[in-house]
Structure formats: structure tokens, C-alpha cells
Amino acid sequence: MEKVITILSEQFQNDNPGVTVTYNPTGSSSGITAASEGSADLGLASRDLKDDDPEGLTATTIAIDGIAIIVNPENDLSDISLDDIAKVYTDQINNWSDLGGTDGDIVCIGREAGSGTRDGFESITDTKDSCVLDQELTSTGDVIQTVANNPNAIGYASMADLNDTVKTLTVDGVAPSEETVLDGTYKIQRNFNVITNDSKTLSPAAQAFFDYITSADAADLISQAGAVPVATSEQ
């Protein structure tokens, strides 16, 4: 979500001189807590609200993001099934040869507890509380860098943050893209949400920013950031 909110913040500040948007990328759970406690005007979360989140909050979806399955460019695998992803991350499959690749122990890279990316990944792969990770990292950038540096690694990362240092696998023959995320054929996806506190009135500047990022005016920038804008898709 960092790439999306950064590009939107920069444009909003350019259009509104004197207004500063501060973003702290500390994870979805922290964003939800900040909105609940009032330490932030808006919380940002790359997951939906859960029953055990604080009450009195509203999540407004601004974009949909595909969670890509990534490997090192040297890996000769090109496709993996959703079922096999779950087996890899629960240590039922632990060698690349079991997937048709070159012999070698699979190194599973994932995000920390509280990460919206991890929550979305585990929810869709049905691996919540059962993942066996070799490394648990605190940012998508760290996941990408680690996979890029380890020929036997596999990881998951926001489609919006992908770069050419890693190789993206198709999942059941479908590549993550704006089209496949929007039509639902790419299954590993989650919402980018803005969290507001129902008991608090936003400042004029915060309200203006909220109105902007939830409008169709932000759609092109959201697409440029690699996510799928909801305002456009629902028109």
C-alpha cells in the first residue's frame, strides 16, 4: 500500500500547497489502531477489518491489489497451483524438485504478524497460523530483496511493489495483472482500505484528502502505482 499512498499524497500536496500528508508505513494493524486511538486522522490497512479489531471504525476500499508469488530469477519454475503454495508454506512440500524444478530446499520468506499482506496471503491460501517461515520480514521491500538474493527462496509481495529483481510465478496459469485481479481470475488478492473513526470528525484537510483518494480522480495514479482502482471499476 505504501507505493499507492505515496503517489496519491505527493499529488495531493502538489495540488494543495501548504498541506502536508504524513505517512508512517508501520503495518495494517498499526494503522487500524492509530485510527481507533486518534493518533492519526486516517488509518491505512491492506486488509479488511476483523471481528477482533476495535469497534466504531469504517473501512473504505480505494484499490484492490494482487499478491504476487515471487522467486529468484534463476528459478526455472514458471507456474504454481494455489494448493501447492499452501503446501510449500506449511512445509508439506520443501524441495523444488517436488514442483518440477531443480533439486534444492525451498526457503520460505514471509511477512511479520500484523501485516496486511500476510493476512491476505494466509486467508486465501488457508494457511493462517500454520505457515512455516524461514525468514519473517517487516516490509515488502525486504521480502523482494531477500528473494532476489537467494536462488532457492520463494516469497509473496504486493503486485504494486514488484520489480525486475525477482520472477513472478503464474498461479494456476494466471498472472497477476489489473485485468485478472479485477475479474477475479487471479485469486490471491486483497483490498487497500482507508480506516476512519466513526466518532471523530476529520479536519478539513484530512476530509479533502479522504475525498480525493476515494474518488475517480485518483484512479489513474492508483493504476500507475500498480493497483486496481475501485472508483473506476465500480462505475
Task: List PLM regions with ranges.
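Exported/periplasmic ABC-transporter solute-binding proteins
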Residues: M1-A40, A45-Q235
